[in-house]
Amino acid sequence: MSYVSATHDRMIAGLILPCRVAGVDLAAGLVRVCDGAGWTSAWVRWHSQAAGKARHWRAPSLGEQGVLISPSGEPAQGTFVPGLYGDAGAQPDNREHVEVWRFDDGGSLVYDWQAKRYSISLPSGTVAIQVGASSALVTDSAITGKADSITLTGAITLNGDVQINGASLKHNGVNVGSTHVHLGVLPGPGATAPPQ
């Protein structure tokens, strides 16, 4: 075989290489990949879901399978496309109407558009939502909401103690808090007037 033919064969063979992650440089956003037979690449970029005005970050895992796509068959110029199911991670679901992220700690993000249900599950920890100065914080043992104004519409059921730390408590515009007063207070069995 001539040198030219051998070079062409090598370049064609190097266009798309099945491989797995051998190293990750998080600060630089680069990975090294290997073919499992002794070859390891130079540091190359990996593909993300988005890298424009909207950007996505998920670092490939060590051992994660994917393919190295190399222009002109030069692996040093390649980019790694992660996400082939294999030894490092099996498929997390098998339903066509579900998008799922499952994480090593047991957490998951699941959207089932057939059931119209979005589920966020953490084994423990914190979920924080921040919009401007308003926030909601969910932990293992408490839910805390903070905003200039909170409006609840609909029937409300509270099972447990209620503690109110505020300057006023009103019902239908009438003060029923700790500073409310009653008129018509007379000794004896008579009833008081409504709160003022």
Where are these regions (language model features)?
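Short, glycine-/Ser/Thr-/acidic-enriched flexible segments
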Residues: 73, 116, 125, 134, ...
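Conserved, well-structured core segments that form or line functional sites
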Residues: 108-110, 116-119, 128, 135, ...
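Intrinsic-disorder/coil detector with helix-boundary
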Residues: 2-4, 19, 130-196
